[in-house]
């Protein structure tokens, strides 16, 4: 009787297990055909021009006589050189790991003594506490803005190389992380008060897909708090770090990596595919059988034909694309500085999401394969770094 009950529990546990992200959508559909539930369809491809409110971001006001001095000592960019316009940067911990990726904008209402810090909305309260804890005797005022006080927008138009939206009171900031991302725009009020742009509004998922296609990570679900390194997050290429400025928290490891270390891993855009041939180009597909929905964050990536150390780590995705932290000499054609080009072994140039256990793989499908791509802006930036050494 005890054995019968144990067998019944085993069957129930496996029968009710939620579908894994490693199985194709058609398999998931068959698995759930006896119920009304169905896998959520990925969003359609993003438009080539549009704007969207970034509800995933929030703003923190920092003002006072010591605001600039304080921020200069805790972020990776040089705020003295950027105090007239917005810029991209990061807060690090003492070990040189990323705490928060942020944009910082001058606050025109504070007479040159104020800034607005844009951060991952889920991390805004944490960053506010962090600043408050370490401001010591600095003369500054700190406040987390309510959602309805101001809104962060992203605007783009691929048909215009010199596109720069005119929005009245706000100053658009060109997104430095990729030439194709467009501009950041701040407006007072909530997202119902849209900026005056000759563009059509679009959901925030459009911006997310565009980020993934450009290989740009954002927020602490993609740039892992206290784990990610600035260079591995491509911050050394996107202008987030001033390597000539004075001391700041986390500077020692960052500078040492720049001058004496080798960055072996970087966040790259990736395509998921199944048994078909590896894709030749990075392309978003929302109507295929492969979907990143349900793939757990930080899932390991390994060689398809043999076991060994991890070659990467999946971070986030939508549809058939996503971001992963990839070992460059294994998953790409890039050659690391001072090292010979790695020769891929025959049959070992395919990579798969590696489940943590057998239970993570459905019986109807095999693990997804992963192909990493190096975006042009990153390839060019790394070439410029190599030439400058």
From Swiss-Prot:
Residues 7-16 have a biased composition (Basic residues). Signal peptide: none annotated. Coiled coil: none annotated. NCBIfam families: ygfZ_signature. It holds the Pfam family GCV_T. GO terms for cellular component: mitochondrial matrix. Keywords: Mitochondrion, Transit peptide. This is Iron-sulfur cluster assembly factor IBA57 homolog, mitochondrial. InterPro entries: GCV_T_N, TrmE/GcvT_dom1, YgfZ/GcvT, YgfZ/GcvT_CS. It comes from Pyricularia oryzae (strain 70-15 / ATCC MYA-4617 / FGSC 8958) (Rice blast fungus). Residues 1-40 form a transit peptide. GO terms for molecular function: transferase activity.
């Amino acid at each position: 009787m005890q054995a019968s009950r144990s067998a019944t529990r085993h069957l129930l546990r496996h029968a009710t297990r939620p579908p894994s992200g490693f199985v194709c959508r058609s398999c998931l559909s068959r698995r759930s055909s006896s119920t009304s539930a169905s896998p959520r369809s990925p969003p359609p491809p993003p438009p080539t021009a549009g704007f969207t409110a970034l509800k995933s971001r929030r703003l923190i006001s920092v003002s006072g006589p010591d605001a600039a001095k304080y921020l200069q000592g805790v972020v990776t960019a040089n705020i003295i050189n950027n105090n007239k316009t917005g810029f991209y940067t990061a807060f690090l911990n003492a070990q040189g790991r990323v705490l928060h990726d942020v944009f910082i904008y001058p606050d025109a209402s504070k007479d040159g003594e104020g800034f607005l810090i844009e951060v991952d909305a889920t991390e805004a309260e944490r960053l506010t506490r962090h600043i408050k804890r370490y401001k010591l005797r600095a003369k500054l005022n700190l406040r987390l803005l309510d959602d309805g006080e101001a809104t962060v927008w992203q605007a783009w138009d691929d048909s215009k190389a010199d596109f720069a939206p005119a929005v009245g009171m706000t100053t658009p900031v060109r997104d430095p992380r990729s030439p194709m991302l467009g501009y950041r725009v701040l407006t007072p009020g909530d997202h119902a008060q849209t900026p005056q742009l000759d563009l059509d509004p679009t959901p925030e998922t459009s911006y997310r897909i565009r980020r993934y296609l450009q290989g740009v990570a954002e927020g602490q679900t993609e740039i892992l708090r206290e784990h990610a390194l600035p260079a591995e997050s491509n911050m050394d290429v996107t202008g987030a770090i001033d390597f000539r400025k004075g001391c700041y928290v986390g500077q020692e490891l960052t500078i040492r990596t720049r001058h004496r270390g080798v960055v072996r891993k970087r966040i790259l855009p990736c395509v998921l595919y199944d048994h078909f041939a590896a894709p030749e180009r990075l392309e978003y597909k929302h109507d295929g059988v492969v979907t990143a929905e349900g793939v757990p964050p930080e899932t390991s990536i390994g060689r398809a034909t043999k076991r060994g150390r991890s070659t990467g780590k999946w971070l986030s995705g939508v549809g058939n694309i996503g971001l992963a932290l990839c070992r460059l000499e294994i998953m790409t054609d890039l050659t690391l500085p001072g090292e010979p080009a790695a020769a891929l072994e025959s049959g070992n140039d395919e990579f798969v999401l590696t489940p943590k256990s057998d239970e993570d793989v459905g019986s109807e499908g095999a693990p997804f394969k992963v192909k990493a791509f190096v975006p042009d802006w990153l390839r060019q930036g790394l070439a410029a770094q190599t030439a400058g050494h």
